Swiss-Prot record:
The enzyme's E.C. designation: 7.4.2.8
Function: Part of the Sec protein translocase complex. Interacts with the SecYEG preprotein conducting channel. Has a central role in coupling the hydrolysis of ATP to the transfer of proteins into and across the cell membrane, serving as an ATP-driven molecular motor driving the stepwise translocation of polypeptide chains across the membrane.
The protein, known as: Protein translocase subunit SecA
Organism: Streptococcus equi subsp. equi (strain 4047)
Alphabetical keyword list: ATP-binding, Cell membrane, Cytoplasm, Membrane, Metal-binding, Nucleotide-binding, Protein transport, Translocase, Translocation, Transport, Zinc
Amino acids binding ATP: 85, 103-107, 493
GO cellular component: cell envelope Sec protein transport complex; cytosol; plasma membrane
Molecular function (Gene Ontology), one example: metal ion binding
Keyword Glycoprotein appears in the UniProt entry: no
Family the entry assigns: Belongs to the SecA family.
Coarse class of the protein's main subcellular location: membrane
Source organism superkingdom: Bacteria
Amino acid sequence: MSNILRKVIENDKGELRKLEKIAKKVESYADYMESLSDKDLQAKTPEFKQRYQNGETLEQLLPEAFAVVREAARRVLGLYPYRVQIMGGVVLHNGDVPEMRTGEGKTLTATMPVYLNALAGEGVHVITVNEYLSTRDATEMGEVYSWLGLSVGINLAAKSPAEKREAYLCDITYSTNSEVGFDYLRDNMVVRQEDMVQRPLNFALVDEVDSVLIDEARTPLIVSGAVSSETNQLYIRADMFVKTLDSVDYIIDVPTKTIGLSDSGIDKAESYFNLSNLYDIENVALTHFVDNALRANYIMLLDIDYVVSEEGEILIVDQFTGRTMEGRRFSDGLHQAIEAKEGVRIQEESKTSASITYQNMFRMYKKLAGMTGTAKTEEEEFREVYNMRIIPIPTNRPIARIDHTDLLYATLNSKFKAVVADVKARYEKGQPVLVGTVAVETSDLISKKLVEAGIPHEVLNAKNHFKEAQIIMNAGQRGAVTIATNMAGRGTDIKLGEGVRELGGLCVIGTERHESRRIDNQLRGRSGRQGDPGESQFYLSLEDELMRRFGTDRIKAFLDRMNNDDEDIVIKSRMLSRQVESAQKRVEGNNYDTRKQVLQYDDVMREQREIIYANRRDVITANRDLGPEIKAMIKRTIDRAVDAHSRTNRKDAIDAIVTFARTSIVPEETIGAKELRGLKDDQIKDKLYQRALEIYDKQLSKLRDQDAILEFQKVLILMIVDNKWTEHIDALDQLRNAVGLRGYAQNNPVVEYQSEGFKMFQDMIGAIEFDVTRTMMKAQIHEQERERAIQYATTTAAQNIQSQAIGADFDSSADFSRVERNDACPCHSGKKFKNCHGRKAF
């Protein structure tokens, strides 16, 4: 035995000795707890809570708290956790993974650490892989928690936000992994604090933890909305509008390739889109469409910045090589604006509003633990990614299952013939059989062959969780034959029917090896629960996917030497099993490397997401004036604009700064180049900033009180942040696709992604601050539109345009016949005619 292996075994033994010592201390309270009346036992919960508030740690409370749960489970459920279950509970409380075999009572084991951690009052999430298991476990184990005075909630996808909020406020919340993730993302998209449903993430206990944190690690949770045809129409409308403009209607800053509408252009936009003010807060999305249409038409040049392919696709031209960049798209909606400009089909895309992987979702919990019967093979990944140890827990009774040596056949046909013959023989003697397959297609194929052989059976393809649990529960009855994909029915025990033990227990037949040893072990673990007899047998063929991809030359050469005329010949040897296991290890290594790379990429977004979400949450929960934050954004925007021209010709620089000031800060006629000539950059910055502060104060003076000001500030920031963040996610996704090709140029794609992703994030922050500045300076604020602004903060751009109010009915007593657009409205509202009754006229 190698020194490393010996050390691992010794470490496991040492850990088990520590756990056993704690378990014995828990057991020492058994007689005392049994002597308590129901009332006195239930009174332990408020006592523990008070002791925790007084400074005792959960570790100090553990022995007594675990003992209370054991006794409560005995009285309520008629179940009494064994010592090994106590040991498993301690491992869970420590934030690790106890590897407990199938049938060893993981669900009951979880009650002890869940109860203990719920005493802190910060919420415990019990995570399952489907809603059936969440509902089942919450109903069954919830009886114990409720009896002990703790509240239990079930978070289901169909529940309303109010119902979800109530579930999350419970001491213990049962939910699926996906629903917890989606709720987290949705909470970071709301505008009001009262619309959030989750509390801060405290302790998660994940059932079937390997399935959630390993198998699904590469699958991101994505909240997205398809870009509707209405939105595509807005690209076209914006394009049609900018094509009507004259050169005086927009101002181009050539060095920075930026463009904006002049005052005359703004007037035309308001008339074209029938708006009172283009820069009102609810029109943030529309200004984005117009800005992109301006860039597409007057800055982006055909055959220089892009080309149109024969298929009508817009292809970006690499400015360094002159080659087209297949698969890349301009971000921020610019690509769609160019498609509208060139009259080609606007590609409908789903817009990702938020996304997160399970890896990063569950790493946000203060403490994370999980249960499974098969995790040791993924020990390195659990340790490196989640900082969780795998602690194998002894079974309560010795395992009596017989695991037969694998059987290898030359062809799929000969293998399936052997499987059907084995199933038939066992069916005829009454022994229940569970046939495990890797794919649904294999399940259907075997089912067809069993029908031909006259063998009644059930087929389970993991499509209906409620039905599958019932089928799996009956799979241990005499004469039962069940076909299931490997993951189907996971989490439900197979109990043996009457007389089945004498027949050898449940026989599990694997029709091929999965690429993961862990999945094979899960299938085997269906049989032989809690010391029951059982058997497992795997059938393989050289035509299996795993063998074709990773089968060794030794196996193939051995079969070549055999009589090829007899395809039913079978190989049965330990050497074969070792070779297959070696192939599985290679696949597992490849998969781990892939997941690790996914995590490296996602960590870039994680860091950025945490910054955006933290700032967003700060805005939502703020009960203070957000003026200092907005003023800081205005200051940085002005500084960036002035610095961008510091190295250009002074006259050109002054002209460009004046252009920026007119389009983004002050009324066009109130500033000119003459006013800024002779000033240094710092003096120009101060002058523009002081002018901006005057406009800022004037804007806020239009709102009636501090509550109205705070609401306006919040909606202003949140709308712009959400728009820019959504666009940034798309841009990062495109960047990730692009950098993958750079590996061929000896560049590390991950490093390239990190570097460019950081620069893009900085650019996004600048864009957010610019839009906040421009909207704050240019918006026409009306107190009566405050509630409307909040409503618009959660709608799409298309809905924004459609929802515009057209204006009040005409006052028949007023004379509108000779009123020009920019004249004061005759109704004496104080507004320009175009912004009042003229809206309907035009």
